[in-house]
């Protein structure tokens, strides 16, 4: 839940700073540092700060009572602040401070932000966002054309969670994390150093900051199909403990037919991509603390049961009716391939395509119980 409260002037309104920064500080404001806190959340705070000395950045800390719960630097580029710098009105940068431990929702308003060296806390924006959402991160995975868009849309609507569509961000950070992991037994000294000093955490913290910044909340839905995202799921557990993973799967005949209608392209490439996604999921799911698998056809034919399965898994049983209703009434793009078109001999494929399908998809089909 996000609420707004009213505080001091100097706000970002409609993408601009209003009133224009660079004015003489008013009574009660620091003559050295200007800034605003714009978001308070259970896992991060964000805003902007300005040190009136060109070339310097403000160091910012968040406190709850006597405890420092977040620390960092205001060094993020933002268009409105960049324009103010170019015009010589204000030397300001944005900041986002993540917390090591979540803050209780009832304590969020008690978080105060300070610029190092300044006694007064950073003022709050008039349109301050207070995000008391429970830490609910839902990752919807699967092969393309398996119903991930339908479920992603349903979850964001029924649970009122932010969703940016297909993010494809986690694989980027996961690859960086793997590169920074290092190896304590390596001959190369730098590689050993990376492992010894836990440089992997740099990528973990970067991913957390990016997800919070993009969604403006500690809770969100990320619907991204494909093998790279499936492979990144264990990394996401590192970034967001307690995350929920929902894997969508679809009969391979219906999936391949839908791919060909939607994307065209090479038949065998679609077969390989489906098989790769399913094989990668078989590997990855053993590394996750928990997950749930949903058959795309069941979302269409048994929405009430699927709604209960999902809400029991995420711990919000009261949302079952909203999810069921959305699954029944909200239909995203459909290719016309049909959930029931599952006989490869009746799919309109050539004999060579049927043989290629059996060769490529057969092992994964049998592993998941498709005849």
Predicted segments, located by residue:
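Basic, ligand-binding patches in group-transfer machinery
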Residues: 3-134
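Catalytic alpha-helical scaffold of carbohydrate-active enzymes acting on polysaccharides/glycoconjugates
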Residues: 32, 197-207, 279, 286
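PAPS-dependent sulfotransferases, especially Golgi type II membrane carbohydrate sulfotransferases
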Residues: 1-26, 111-113, 117, 127-129, ...
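PAPS-dependent sulfotransferase catalytic core
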Residues: 113, 127-204
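PAPS-dependent sulfotransferase catalytic domain
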Residues: 178, 214-321
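A polyampholytic, Gly/Pro-enriched intrinsically disordered region
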Residues: 184-192, 266-273, 340-347
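Short acidic/His/Gly/Ser-rich catalytic and metal-binding motifs that mark active-site loops
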Residues: 173, 254-258, 335
